[in-house]
Amino acid sequence: MINEAPLARFAPLAGGLLKPIYSDYSFANIANTIEHLLTDDVRGPLLPADCFGGVYPRPRKVVTFFVDSFGWAFWKAHGDRFRTTRAVMEKGVVTPISALFPSTTAASVSTLNLGVPPSAHALYEWNIYIPAYGEVIQSLAFAPLGRHGQDACVKKGYDPAKMLDVHETVHQRLARHGVRSVQFSNRSYAGSAYNSVASAGADVIRHGTLSEALVQLKETLEQDAEKAWLGFYWASIDTIAHIHGPGTPFHAAEIASFWSTFDAVFRDVDSPDTVYLFFADHGQVYADVHDTIYINERFPELADCLPLSPTGHPIYPNGAPRDVFLHVRPERRDDVLATLQQGLDGIVLVLPMHEALNQGLFGPGPVSPELRRRLGDILILPFQGHFVWWRERGVMGNMFNGHHGGLAPDELVTVFGAIDAL
């Protein structure tokens, strides 16, 4: 069954952009729903019962398949091609839901692991200013801007726990109820600084390939009788969409590679009292990388508007080419806002940050004071088909034809699927 009713819940913002949903049909509520299914606790808003056919199941095990970037538009375009996705549509329920804002993996994996929206945990983007460090870093990589290896910030003495403003994890809460959490993570990040914080309380099983991960998951599921959440994440569809752009032959081939392997390996699973959940954090938007508008080059008079942190580092723009967060020197805020609103009219929505917060774009209040310090002063939201960013040689620029983070339907409307047998 395809449950399209939530599509009517999305309200317009401006220029074809949509407002995110947090109260019900939202990625923000997946973690609460998992906890509810396994413990009966209600910590906050849940995904509505119609996402499960009208009644919440009471499984002993919940298996989640987090397929990065495989949002609603891609599920619609490719869902009929593969055994598993067809089964979820025909025998389970597939529901369009809202991504978070920003529609990013950094925000989403933090929300899934902690059970709170970005307004509470404060880790909203890949490029993000952390006042405790005095500079903008790449959050999940835990590295400074520029070309650095993963966890380079550890060598600078930074505490990765300070990236998040909430520290109790879903895994720790489940453990108090006697529910095991097992996360299947790629070796490239399984032991990373970020993952060590976000996955606290979970058992982490490492893999190098998709087939290895799916065999590990199937064997764990069939051999372990205890109550458990088994969580799987896969990034490659998102990676290829970034490099070549969504909707390209490369993207379609990666989608086929993932689901064909899934169909071949993860089938005839012997695990009663289990529910399988499929979801994505967002979709993607295409634009030609060469058409990226660089703010500091389009408007040279704005090149000196960035403030310095207390440690003397420039506070470079946060976010990405679909959601730009500008920290601006106080005396320049009015003229920078006016320049962007006038010079990019018809291309972007430009908002003072307090207005974005007042509209609840980051989730329900109260808003973490730490988030407010990180966000800066001006938010730039490009319309569909546009990338806007900042270029600083050796520090930042745009190399991709696919991005997400903003509020266009193709990136904001994502998907949640549920089925009780595979």
PLM feature spans:
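Feature captures the catalytic ectodomains and active-site-proximal regions of enzymes
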Residues: 1-422
